[in-house]
């Protein structure tokens, strides 16, 4: 059984998948906050081969390692010049966040041969571009939806903290809705700009805030759950599957 782990800045997402299973055909899937991580020990016990993407630092890596089955074959996923049909065009390939690299691999596996814009919407929002020939050419990083909303509350005297999960009208007639409309537009703009800049690109949106941000997009797109885990699965197996946005 293969265990795939996506350790992000706020949560750790994971999936178990049988050898030979189709791309993204999980046997089990879950998530936990960093504080709750110990609860996954029993779930992870069946993972004999493990692939981990970790962007949350060495302390969390040590906690993850301590929870894995003794004797498990563990690979700490890293950005490399090439993997799973994707060529890493970052100026220094090793400096590309491993989660972004995995997400691009996942998108490429789902939509082979297509130009791609891959948006992952979590604590931060990343918007990355992959050419049809499989070259990752770079991207954008911006504060995530909730972080944008909370920064206004922290740094202005009279603006309230708002829930970034509520869908507002375009023109808010109260301060909360005006903030939410503003931050949604600020999230959608870079994605739409990337699609326009790449030209006729397939757009894949993933992450916890993806359903809210997708509602504001004016370009064709598809929301794909757990694109980093899909990418880890593709990186480990070479599997592809086709989807259309």
Q: Where does each model-flagged region fall?
A:
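Active-site regions of enzymes building and remodeling cell-envelope glycoconjugates
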Residues: 68-74, 91-93, 218-226
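Glycine-rich phosphate-binding/hydrolytic loop that grips phosphoryl groups
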Residues: 221-245
